[in-house]
Swiss-Prot record:
Protein's name in the database: ATP synthase subunit alpha 2
Reaction catalysed by this enzyme: ATP + H2O + 4 H(+)(in) = ADP + phosphate + 5 H(+)(out)
Residues that, per the record, bind ATP: G169, D170, R171, Q172, T173, G174, K175, T176
Localization annotation: Cell membrane
Annotated keywords: ATP synthesis, ATP-binding, Cell membrane, CF(1), Hydrogen ion transport, Ion transport, Membrane, Nucleotide-binding, Translocase, Transport
EC code(s) of this entry: 7.1.2.2
Residues with site note (Required for activity): S362
Summary of subunit composition and partner proteins: F-type ATPases have 2 components, CF(1) - the catalytic core - and CF(0) - the membrane proton channel. CF(1) has five subunits: alpha(3), beta(3), gamma(1), delta(1), epsilon(1). CF(0) has three main subunits: a(1), b(2) and c(9-12). The alpha and beta chains form an alternating ring which encloses part of the gamma chain. CF(1) is attached to CF(0) by a central stalk formed by the gamma and epsilon chains, while a peripheral stalk is formed by the delta and b chains.
Keyword ATP-binding tagged: yes
Top class in the EC scheme: translocase
SUPFAM superfamilies tied to this protein: C-terminal domain of alpha and beta subunits of F1 ATP synthase, N-terminal domain of alpha and beta subunits of F1 ATP synthase, P-loop containing nucleoside triphosphate hydrolases
PROSITE patterns in the record: ATPASE_ALPHA_BETA
Organism: Listeria monocytogenes serotype 4b (strain F2365)
Gene: atpA2
Length: 504
């Protein structure tokens, strides 16, 4: 049998051409400690920070601490079946979540797995949960408004697309309601919403999902939930999963609103993991990198420049305060990262002012440039008027003999507070907000009894819908006030039909 060199060389060439390289990582370690959502493993000398690791029972973990002799791992799932001495294997991958249109209308966990019982999610796209935030030259300044439908926010602390606006307040002051109402108001705004519930009760998340479904908002919303019963690693990862899903839409030129409800619970989960992993505690026992925990998350919210499609992520992070103390560690951290804050005060909430927004401590650092011209015109002096009223109100308690000008200011202030009240799940379109604020500023409400102000607003909106829809349409399309004479005439005409009720 003769061997021909040409045949051998052609066979070798063929095999080289058909060769497919596959990265196979076969490092195997041994679990030396397991408990409370974390594990330690020996023998994974080449593991990378943030790498996914697989335990022998199929549960995944993520390498967090790379030490001399072992690796600290956070476990992404039930850890009760893992035993000391079990094998743990490197995968060579980093943590990714599914992304894309198929997620809209679904409720998923921190790993992107469906938890709503509606079957698997048909999507092939994935994104890593950790990503570099857009750089300076990839962004543009905030210039488009995000209409929340809440008068007190759109007038006093306007939010723009691509902004990060902190919502801060004690528990039970209506923080979640503000976010849900904002999501409901995005129905016709070409906006995708992602609601990330961190450490909430299952029943609370269920109520939020049902509210969104009832109002048709699930058609453009993804809910990411890491409930209070879940292990701490899933609470820690939930916000990153939410923003990874949002980035897919942003880089495709779409606008996304992400609500993180709330980051205090994420910080507490991260503190728990860090202490279990024996990292040195700092102030309030939080680890030294708790600022970076939130800054790297919130910096991923941006308004991209036009060459990248002009998409945006607007972030509404929540932080819970204790007894209104906004100078605690986590609140001050997040205030310094965000572009403004909306402070909800329990005193106002319990006195019936809802949403309970404290106009003095709330601020929007970049939203003003995104506010529409009509709203800027009517709401220009509103914040100062409100601050002056609060000051006068405290003085007026001490003396009854007030001069006419002071009395007039107090009366106007009462009506301003009343106008800014709003019912739950009833967001208001911006043109109707402009209308009632115009009526307030131009003294149409001065002789309307305070208890009738909200009825006046409701009847005025209905009357304008039927008799002067063209004025509302003009505000909506031009974003400017219509001809003043026409608007004044219409308001006077309505005012003549309004019948004040008897004093209560």
């Amino acid at each position: 049998m003769s061997i021909k060199a040409e045949e051998i060389s052609s066979i070798i060439k063929q095999q080289i051409e058909n060769y497919q390289s596959e990265l196979k990582v076969s490092d195997v370690g041994t679990v030396t400690y397991i408990g409370d959502g974390i594990a330690r493993a020996h023998g994974l000398d080449n593991a990378m920070a943030g790498e996914l690791l697989e335990f022998s029972n199929g549960v995944m973990g993520m390498a967090q601490n790379l030490e001399t002799n072992d690796v600290g791992i956070i476990i992404l799932g039930p850890y009760t079946e893992i035993r000391e001495g079990d094998e743990v294997r490197r995968t060579g991958k980093i943590m990714e979540v599914p992304v894309g249109e198929a997620l809209i209308g679904r409720v998923v966990n921190s790993l992107g797995q469906p938890v709503d019982g509606l079957g698997p999610i048909e999507t092939t796209g994935t994104r890593p949960i950790e990503a570099v935030a857009p750089g300076v030259m990839q962004r543009q300044s905030v210039n488009e408004p995000l209409q929340t439908g809440i008068k007190a926010i759109d007038a006093l602390v306007p939010i723009g697309r691509g902004q990060r606006e902190l919502i801060i307040g004690d528990r039970q002051t209506g923080k979640t309601s503000v976010a849900i109402d904002t999501i409901l108001n995005q129905a016709d705004q070409d906006m995708i919403c992602i609601y990330v519930a961190i450490g909430q009760k299952e029943s609370t998340v269920r109520n939020a999902v049902e509210t969104l479904r009832h109002h048709g908002a699930l058609d453009y919303t993804i809910v990411v939930t890491a409930a209070a019963s879940q292990p701490a690693p899933l609470l820690y990862l939930a916000p990153y999963a939410g923003v990874a899903m949002a980035e897919e839409f942003m880089y495709n030129g779409k606008h996304v609103l992400v609500v993180y409800d709330d980051l205090s619970k994420q910080a507490a989960a991260y503190r728990e993991l860090s202490l279990l992993l024996r990292r040195p505690p700092g102030r309030e026992a939080y680890p030294g990198d708790v600022f970076y925990l939130h800054s790297r998350l919130l910096e991923r919210a941006a308004k991209l420049n036009d060459s990248l499609g002009g998409g945006s992520i607007t972030a509404l992070p929540f932080v819970e305060t204790q007894a209104g103390d906004i100078s605690a560690y986590i609140p001050t951290n997040v205030i310094s990262i965000t572009d403004g804050q909306i402070f909800l005060q329990s005193d106002l909430f319990f006195s019936g002012v809802r949403p309970a927004i404290n106009a003095g401590l709330s601020v929007s650092r970049v939203g003003g440039s995104a506010q529409i011209k009509a709203m800027k015109t009517v709401a220009g002096t509103l914040r100062l008027d409100l601050a002056a009223y609060r000051e006068l109100e405290s003085f007026s308690q001490f003396g009854s003999d007030l001069d006419a000008a002071t009395r007039a200011k107090l009366e106007r202030g009462k009506r301003t507070v009343e106008v800014l009240k709003q019912d739950l799940h009833k967001p208001l379109k911006v043109e109707k907000q402009v209308l009632i604020l115009y009526a307030l500023v131009h003294k149409y409400l001065d002789d309307v009894p305070v208890h009738d102000v909200l009825r006046f607003e409701s009847e005025m909106n209905t009357w304008f819908d039927h008799n002067h829809p063209e004025l509302l349409e003009e505000i909506r399309t031009t974003k400017k006030l219509p001809d003043e004479a026409k608007l004044e005439a219409a308001l006077k005409e309505f005012k003549n039909t309004f019948v004040p009720s008897e004093e209560k």
